[in-house]
Amino acid sequence: MSAYQVAALPEGFTKLDAMESPYHPFAHSPQLQAEWAARLAEAPIHLYPNPATSGLQAALRQAFDIPAAAEIALGNGSDELIQLITMLVAKPGAAVLALEPSFVMYRHNAQVYGLDYIGVPLNDDFSMNLPAVLEAIAAHRPALVFVSYPNNPTGVGFSRAQVQAVIDAAPGIVVVDEAYGAF
């Protein structure tokens, strides 16, 4: 077995799929670099973080007007959260449904945890084929549905009515993955 290697980009291509910046955050600000280094030196990085994350949850509730009754789950990036949610529903016969093409981790995690994976093709213009999605939900009764919004890798958004129709039809958990919402 050999280590995974990221292929070099062809000439003239720009990598946009990993939410990475080609610019170093401190390249033009030695002062900012020094401030970050000082803060990092004081951080207890030898300890696990507080699992309750109550301070962060309170800040998120205030910043985004999240009701106290709503649960907040935090993780180390969306890959971890997708994995945890998939593990949550993993049992024999359970299914995961996602639009295709979409973020590869939906299919990957379904396969890793032994879940059936149902990929519903997008239309030729990458819009959601809502009748096909609703038909697949009715036929397979997935425990988990992923809607990447805007879709990764196409960048196409779906209407609020379409997303709500998926939520209303799904018998299980619906994850609206807005990792690329800012883009």
Q: What are these model-predicted stretches?
A:
Residues 1-48, 141:
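N-terminal "arm"/small-domain region of PLP-dependent enzymes with the aminotransferase-like
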Residues 44-171, 175, 180-183:
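Conserved core of the PLP fold type I
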